[in-house]
């Protein structure tokens, strides 16, 4: 997971789906 200002795609969410919006 990377800190971004948008929806992040990560395998931790289940197959690289847009699952969370990171807050800096």
From Swiss-Prot:
Disulfide pattern: 7-19
Tissue: Expressed by the skin glands.
Family matches, as InterPro entries: Prokineticin_domain (IPR023569)
Places the protein is found: Secreted
Major localisation: secreted
GO biological processes: defense response; positive regulation of insulin secretion
Stored Gene3D superfamilies: Lipase, subunit A
The entry's keywords: Amphibian defense peptide, Disulfide bond, Secreted
GO cellular component: extracellular region
Entry's transmembrane regions: none
Domain of life: Eukaryota
Role noted for this protein: Stimulates insulin secretion by BRIN-BD11 cells in vitro.
Family membership: Belongs to the AVIT (prokineticin) family.
Protein name: Prokineticin 1-like protein
Lineage: Eukaryota, Metazoa, Chordata, Craniata, Vertebrata
